[in-house]
């Protein structure tokens, strides 16, 4: 598989405080990569660099290189709207917009300039099916998306991200606010979808990372400690500190 996103020597500072210390990490296409590590290690900060979600934070400075399909995403010619269409995001707290399920899914399509009602209808249905939420919503497309359960709302958010046909979806702890049953349903959905999309997921749940990811990156204190196939890292980590973290000795 080819690398769809590459990062080289990425540093990020908030004012005089450096949060990322030169991370170099590549992501293979149509694989699910988990970013793990203790709270405050830089997982979410790094994830948000990959589609420039950190841009509006005051006094932030980012250096190094991040490329999406060999294009420098921090270059002067990068179109942010296009980047975020290709590299979508699902947040920790389910965040559907306060309007109907249909309009939530259609939102990104309309922003992208799609006006064909038939095409929008088709994409709405396809995306809700991909996110395994069609059965619960097909007779309630006009219902406010915020009226559904937390797990259903998160799958609606995943469907909204998929509707614009991104190539990569960033997931920032997508199940941490959900109950175990809803979390399991999201995991099953991701296992189905990872054959068609590239996923990069921050998770505190090591069992979740071992169950559904193909590759794992372990970060600590703003440094990349270890990266490799998930099965290899969990069975035979290369570094003692990785073994200590995976075995619950800290974190």
Curated annotation (Swiss-Prot):
Gene Ontology biological-process annotations: phosphate ion transmembrane transport
Catalysed reactions listed for this entry: phosphate(out) + ATP + H2O = ADP + 2 phosphate(in) + H(+)
Residue ranges annotated for the ABC transporter domain, each copy included: 5-246
Keyword Magnesium applies: no
Lineage: superkingdom: Bacteria
Entry membrane topology: Peripheral membrane protein
Pfam families: ABC_tran (PF00005)
EC number(s) reported in the record: 7.3.2.1
GO molecular function, a single term: ATPase-coupled phosphate ion transmembrane transporter activity
PROSITE patterns attached to this UniProt entry: ABC_TRANSPORTER_1, ABC_TRANSPORTER_2, PSTB
GO annotations of cellular component type: plasma membrane
Compartmental location: Cell membrane
CDD domains the record matches: ABC_PstB_phosphate_transporter
InterPro entries tied to this protein: AAA+_ATPase, ABC_transporter-like_ATP-bd, ABC_transporter-like_CS, P-loop_NTPase, PstB-like
Swiss-Prot/TrEMBL keywords: ATP-binding, Cell membrane, Membrane, Nucleotide-binding, Phosphate transport, Translocase, Transport
Binding-site positions, ATP: 37-44
Task performed by this protein: Part of the ABC transporter complex PstSACB involved in phosphate import. Responsible for energy coupling to the transport system.
Subunit-level organization: The complex is composed of two ATP-binding proteins (PstB), two transmembrane proteins (PstC and PstA) and a solute-binding protein (PstS).
NCBIfam families hit by this protein: 3a0107s01c2
Family in the record: Belongs to the ABC transporter superfamily. Phosphate importer (TC 3.A.1.7) family.
Protein name (database record): Phosphate import ATP-binding protein PstB 2
Source organism: Lactobacillus johnsonii (strain CNCM I-12250 / La1 / NCC 533)
């Amino acid at each position: 598989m080819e690398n769809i996103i590459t990062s080289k020597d990425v540093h990020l500072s908030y004012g005089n405080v450096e949060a990322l210390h030169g991370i170099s990490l590549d992501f293979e296409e149509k694989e699910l990569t988990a970013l793990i590590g203790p709270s405050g290690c830089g997982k979410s900060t790094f994830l948000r660099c990959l589609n420039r979600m950190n841009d509006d934070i005051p006094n932030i400075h980012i250096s190094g290189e991040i490329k999406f399909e060999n294009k420098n995403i921090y270059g002067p010619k990068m179109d942010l709207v296009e980047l975020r269409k290709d590299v979508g995001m699902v947040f920790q707290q389910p965040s559907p917009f306060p309007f109907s399920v249909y309009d939530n899914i259609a939102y990104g399509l309309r922003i992208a300039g799609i006006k064909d009602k038939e095409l929008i209808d088709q994409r709405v249905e396809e995306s809700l099916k991909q996110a395994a939420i069609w059965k619960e919503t097909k007779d309630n497309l006009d219902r406010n998306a915020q009226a559904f359960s937390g797990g259903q709302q998160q799958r609606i958010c995943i469907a909204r991200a998929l509707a614009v046909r991104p190539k990569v979806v960033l997931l920032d702890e997508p199940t941490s606010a959900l109950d175990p049953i809803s979390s399991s349903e999201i995991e099953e959905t991701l296992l189905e979808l990872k054959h068609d999309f590239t996923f990069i997921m921050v998770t505190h749940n090591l069992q979740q990372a071992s169950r559904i990811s193909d590759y794992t990156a372990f970060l600590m204190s703003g440094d990349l400690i270890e990266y490799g196939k998930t099965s290899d890292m969990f069975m035979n980590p290369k570094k003692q500190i990785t073994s200590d973290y995976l075995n619950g000795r800290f974190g």
